[in-house]
Structures are given as structure tokens and as C-alpha cells.
Amino acid sequence: MPKILALAGLASLLAAPAYAQLPATTAHTDTYAVATLGGVAPAAAPITVAEVEAAQRAWGNALVAISTEYKTNGQAAAARLAGQVLDTAYGYSLGPVAFKPTLASGETTFRTTREGALAYFVGGDANFPSDTGFALKGWQSYAIDNAAIVLNGSTAISTGNVMLTNDKGEVTTVNKSWGWVRDANGALRIVLHHSSLPYSAH
């Protein structure tokens, strides 16, 4: 059963009086919940569920493309492609990005800069010596299973599972949350990316 987000009480938690006058709404698709938060409508066009799903697919396609580029042409070529992906999909040109990768720890857990994100995906940076390149692990396909998408004007958040299959047929599942904003050119930019391995009690 899809989970429906109950956001009716959210307005009381927000300081701006204008929000209290606009109720939140909820809806659902066949497999996951969609929430549209009430609030002051931004000047930019509201982000839609279709745009969020397209952005998710673009991310998955890019990860597979970087892995393929690495296998075909080596690390330098993969790094160039990864840089292009960061420049088009992420919001580092807007400021820090709240990026917590799956396989990161210690002082380099959070990758708020483009440099840190690039190192995580393709390695090869002495400032991030533990990074071996998450995007270089032979990924061949992916599947996305959303638990919820939250829409709020020109911002959106999703959470769910991403299943990644490598060239050995092994599947890695990661719990993933993304947050997007619409930039001045109308494109969606990732400004939040949190990824972790599923918790195991054993």
C-alpha cells in the first residue's frame, strides 16, 4: 500500500502566517506517496512528479554511463564525464550541496563541494584518499522504488530505494533521499542527496 503523507498539521509548525492560510494536500501514485505542501507560490513554475521521476532516471543513467566510460576509456575519461554530470545535475553552482554519500566517513562524510562529490564518484583525489570511485564499480543497470515524493513549489524531495546491478549481476540496494530546486534557467538541480546502506540488526 502506498503511504499517504499527512501534512495537515504542518502549517502550525511554520512561522510565516501566510503558510497557515494554504492547506497541504496529499495524493498518491500506484506505488508511492506524493505530497504538495501549502505555501506561498514561488515565481518559478512548480516542480512536477514527472520532472522528479525524469531527474531520478537521469541520475541513474549517468551513473551507468560513468561506469561504462571507465571500463571503456579509463579513469580520466570517467572523471570528465562525471564532472559534466555534476555541472548539469547538481546545484554546486548555486552554493553548497547537502550530499552525504553511501560510502563515506570521518571528516569527509559530507561532500558539500563539487571537488568532494567528484572524488566520491570517480576517486583519484589526494584530498579524499579513501575514495575509490563509487561510479566505477561496474554498474550496468538500476531500478528506483520511491517511497514518497514531496512537492513544494519550485522545490521537491524524494525518498526510497535505488537498486544498482553491477557487471557480475550483483545487486546493491541503497536507501536514498534527493532534494531539488528549480534554477534560474528552469532546470532541476540536486541540492540534497543522502544515501546509506539498509540497516541490519544482525
Positions of PLM-derived features:
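Acidic, glycine-rich flexible loop segments
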Residues: 128-176
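Gram-negative bacterial Sec-dependent N-terminal signal peptides
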Residues: 1-21
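Short beta-strand edge/turn micro-motifs at domain boundaries
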Residues: 31-33, 151-159, 169-201
